[in-house]
Amino acid sequence: HGQTDDGMRTLLGFLHFPAVAAQLRERSRVEAPTLHREAPRVLDVIYLSTLDLSRLPATTVGEGALRYLIVADKGEMGVRAVREAVAFGATPVVLYSAQDDSGALQVRLAERHGGFGISLEGSFRESYANPVQIAARIHEVYAERFGSEGAPQALACSALYPGYGPLAENTAAIEHFRHEGIVFVGPMQDVVESAGDKRKFRLLAQSIDDDAVVPGIVLEDDDPMEIVGLIRAAHRAERFSFPGRLKAANGGGGRGQVIVEAPERVPGAVEKVLGEIAANGWDPGVMFEQNIAETIHLEVQVLRDRYGNTRHFGMRDCTEQRASQKIQEEAPPALLRAYPGLTERICELAVRIADEVGYVGACTVELMFKDGHYYLLEMNTRIQVEHPVTEAAHRIRTADGLQPLDLVALQFGIAAGAPIPFAQEDVVATHAAREFRINAESWKPKLKDSRDGKVGMFLPNAGVFDVIELPEERTVIAALAADGVHGIQELGIRFDCGFEPGDTLVNKDPTFGKLIVSVATDEAHAEERYELLRRASIEVLRRLRIEGRQVLSNGQVIEGSRFETNREDHIRVLESDLMRQHGRGPVPDRHVGWVVDMLRRG
């Protein structure tokens, strides 16, 4: 009935009654899969009519009309997005820097599959992070390609996918795209502002669970003397104790924060953080929190569609880090086996937060963990670098059996107006998985790190790839069996890489690939699965061949040189005494700084 014009008018008339609108909204959420399949226009109208779109604006093309995916990321994520677009049935359109990436793998792949590239002028920041240039170039190229009459229709069937690149959490960029008529795959700017701002996230989390945040205060002021006075007053009121941590509300990756050892050091810390806020163009605002040292880093993967269906995919352990950057991730976390029920409690909190802000797309809720207590930190309003480890650890139960989890494909489906096509109970953890960020860098024990003044640091290098070769699963299992290691029922080896042999990595993010190893065990070895994962990962890393030669910053090859990666450093981490204990249960000395501490000790 709703597909006729009279029926549509009747539906819209009912929506003047709030109680009816609420019932219709809930019914559309529950029946979204059926409606999307049988009457997508009706589902679109109900969605657009029953939600307060001044707060939760439309974020999808609707009616499953997504035909062009504009990829706005590069490297391994750009390559993944192009391949997923092709598998989704959409034409890949790749944004690229003419200065740096005209021959990049993601551009070649798009053209190979009937897509096209849109060149941008300037360096990384001037191109990939420039929404004004990007929107203008999209309109220009679409007009050239589809004609002045066809361009608006083609753009209406397009969506821009930011991956985890510089546009992903950029509220000004998201708003600009909205005004330019470009659908953004992910939440709109109002949701990013409320969920991605650490201050607002802290207040929201505190309203749900007062014990789920670190003791501290949120400060909206930008006057240094006022901030110092408020911090000192809160300390006198015993709101927190020292040492503390002063953080910019919009910092990240270890930037915009400083540890404050004692009250007398507050003024210097305030001056430093406010200087970083000004230098980076961040919105003003800081938080002062009690510093909880040597914590475990955990996070929850969440997905939500525009109809209000929210799913979580368990947790990840991202404690292995260097310079506040993750280098290994694990799913599900081995240590949480010692805390029954905690995973579900934390995941339910993350789902409530996503529901509260009206999130649309993929997001991650990050938290610290120590001695059985958790502290929610922030929501990353984008797909994370480490999402493949969650995919490798989970399957989706369907009528046809267990199917792989593909978070990027689900993001595309949501952008096309589709509901999440499975229930929470259909998400099944089947494997233990570990991800290794393969970086163009290696550990140099004699170099002094200017960031902390200590000796020992990872030094990046650039190079041309000659060989990129993965071992076969059966070869690894046979090698393990020969060494007396048994019980692996299924071994997964996956390598997400932004390059092919012959490509050159220069002046780019050192992370050029992600190796994901996963194991499923037979019932007799279920308790040993994390030790089996460790042993399998070592064997895979040893057999992973990445060879090349170093290049200068201009791309000139240094003959006789060897392109260096952190592959051997990953093996050293896995062979450490701490990681041998990790598979059996919580390890007291394991925290976000342990890897660098261990390497520095030699």
Q: Which residue ranges define each predicted feature?
A:
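ATP-binding N-terminal substructure of ATP-dependent carboxylate-amine bond-forming enzymes
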Residues: 2-209, 220-229
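ATP-dependent carboxylate activation and anion-phosphoryl transfer catalytic cores
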Residues: 12-20, 27-94, 115, 128-129, ...
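Bateman (tandem CBS) regulatory domains
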Residues: 188, 206-212, 326-334
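Conserved anion/nucleotide-ligand pocket segment
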Residues: 246
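Glycine/aspartate-rich loop-and-adjacent alpha/beta segment that forms the canonical ThDP
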Residues: 258
